[in-house]
């Protein structure tokens, strides 16, 4: 293909990224990598700060792309500038629209006011000829009322705009609360496309947490402080200060049992991922399905003592056992003990009856 034609095709498939990053020192190859991941300029503009960090970390860790420090800041700066430009353009359009409506409203009120002035002037001249009231006085009063109505109209428009902004903010906040973590079910080695990340990336976050824990332990030893042995709030705060704001306590605690299955039985974990991917299940259903294999492993290896299994594993010993997983193991232990007790009772009862029989 001709180089110029190739460049034209490249521009068409960039999704507006080259224009977005043009003045911010982002390499063309970096922009093309981001486009290969399925992102466009509009997609990036709609993403939150944490999601942008996730995207850049996926680019670095999963795609093994050497993302420069300046490019990280340049991407965010370009997005902020474009958002600001779009917002200013919307404000200008809104201002012109409001001004036109206010002008038309004022003209309509002015026409009505003039008619009322003529009517009042005629009545004053007929009914109050000697009272000293003049048409000029009536005109001044009407002008005052007209100004008052105009001010009231402008105030009402501003109030309506403020209420709409507040409702929009409430809707955005509600969407943020309802929004689940940005993961989709992927097979091992599969790279997720779009705004959501795959499960390989999720498991990689747990390895990153382990690295942050080691750094916190090293700093604590240098300062003579108590070293944490598990991933605690101190580790999450350290990760946030280090720039890894995409690592947070709710997200990591939510999927820790899925990571445990990945560590204890990678073959079973991969089979489960493949099955749910083929059926088109979402990540919430896959997360729930990860409990049962773990309970089975706990019953087979340690008599349902899931804490012992976590503590004996080098990658799991730094994580707290989820309460639900512990409760499930306890329930299975109890039901198994009850079943064994019932079986023992039913087996021993006929023997006792046989001994009572006379010979």
Curated annotation (Swiss-Prot):
The keyword DNA repair does not apply. GO terms for cellular component: nucleus. InterPro entries: FLO/LFY_C, FLO_LFY, Floricaula/leafy_C_sf, LFY_SAM. One of its GO terms (biological process) is regulation of DNA-templated transcription. It comes from the Eukaryota. Residues 179-183, 248-255, 320-323 bind DNA. Residues 113-170, 340-359 are annotated as: Disordered. The record marks 226, 233, 237, 284 as: Interaction with DNA. Keywords: Activator, Developmental protein, DNA-binding, Nucleus, Transcription, Transcription regulation. The keyword Nuclease does not apply. It is found in: Nucleus. This is Leafy/floricaula homolog FL1. It comes from Eucalyptus globulus (Tasmanian blue gum).
């Amino acid at each position: 293909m001709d180089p110029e034609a190739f460049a034209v095709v490249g521009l068409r498939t960039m999704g507006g990224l080259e224009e977005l990053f043009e003045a911010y020192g982002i390499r063309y190859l970096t922009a093309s990598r981001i486009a290969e991941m399925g992102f466009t300029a509009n997609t990036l503009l709609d993403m939150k700060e944490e999601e942008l960090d996730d995207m850049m970390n996926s680019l670095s860790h999963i795609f093994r792309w050497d993302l420069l420090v300046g490019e990280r800041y340049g991407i965010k700066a370009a997005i902020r500038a474009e958002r600001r430009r779009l917002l200013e353009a919307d404000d200008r359009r809104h201002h012109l629209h409001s001004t036109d409506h206010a002008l038309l409203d004022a003209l309509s009120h002015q026409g009505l006011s003039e008619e009322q002035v003529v009517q009042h002037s005629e009545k004053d001249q007929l009914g109050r000829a000697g009272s000293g009231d003049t048409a000029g006085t009536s005109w001044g009063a009407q002008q005052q009322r007209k100004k008052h109505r105009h001010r009231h109209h402008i105030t009402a428009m501003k109030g309506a705009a403020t209420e709409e902004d507040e409702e929009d903010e409430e809707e955005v906040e509600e969407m943020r609360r309802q929004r689940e973590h940005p993961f989709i079910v992927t097979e091992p080695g599969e790279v997720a496309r779009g705004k959501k990340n795959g499960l390989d990336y999720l498991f990689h976050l747990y390895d990153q947490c382990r690295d942050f824990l080691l750094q916190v332990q090293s700093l604590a030893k240098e300062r003579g402080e108590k070293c944490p042995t598990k991933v605690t709030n101190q580790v999450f705060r350290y990760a946030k200060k280090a720039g890894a704001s995409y690592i947070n306590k709710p997200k990591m605690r939510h999927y820790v049992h899925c990571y445990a299955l990945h560590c204890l039985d990678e073959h079973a974990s991969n089979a489960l991922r493949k099955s749910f991917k083929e059926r088109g299940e979402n990540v919430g259903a896959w997360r729930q399905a990860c409990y049962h294999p773990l309970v089975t492993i706990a019953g087979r290896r340690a008599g349902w003592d899931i804490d012992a299994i976590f503590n004996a594993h080098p990658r799991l010993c730094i994580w707290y056992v989820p309460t639900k997983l512990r409760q499930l193991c306890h329930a299975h232990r109890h039901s198994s003990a009850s079943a064994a007790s019932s079986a023992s009772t039913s087996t021993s009862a006929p023997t006792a009856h046989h001994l009572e029989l006379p010979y």
